[in-house]
Amino acid sequence: MAVEPPLPHLVLPVRAATPSGELVRLRRLVDGEPRPDSSSEYDDWGVFDIHFEEDWHDRAMVEVSPAAGGPWVPVGDMSWHSELHGPNLGSRAISIGVSLRADARGRGIGTVAQSLLACALHRGGVHRVQASTDVANVAEQRSLERAGFVREGVARAAQVRADGRHDLVLYSCLPGEPVFVAQ
């Protein structure tokens, strides 16, 4: 049974700039469109049911362009999915994640992309936007904090990868909280 992705009519913001002036934009992935290779040490999922992956979330391409203008270059992608924290839609949160090519990391692109998506989700009526990352992924923790997310704590043994269970650091962003890019 196919499940409709969360917020299928979400309007993604046009673009925003990194501190170095690179422009970042998000655009929805087209069905079957290849994604950039953005694998990292945190992506070894082991046995994975691809049908589950395709049915439970939505995706956007992360693209960059030089500050002076030029072509948009895909450097990664983002995903988001619904999570319920209670029995009603008011208890729904949207969890987001970003994955960037190795050469795009450390440039502020992930910070801007996560902030853009959080702003779009808030404008689309989502109250709680959340993210999580491995406790060892300090770079992503800093990126989320720069994007305006608030660290909430650690979810112990919350994620399973090929080498076993991993603790995750949880973050959230609520409407009205400061974010990296203007709303």
Model-flagged regions — what are they?
Residues 1-104, 120-129, 136, 158, ...:
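GNAT-family acyltransferases
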Residues 97, 104-111, 153:
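Alpha-helical hinge/cap motifs
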Residues 106-120, 138-146:
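Conserved acetyl-CoA-binding loop-helix of GNAT-fold acetyltransferases
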Residues 109, 132-133:
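Residues that cap or flank secondary-structure elements
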Residues 145-155:
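Conserved acetyl-CoA-binding loop of GNAT-fold acetyltransferases
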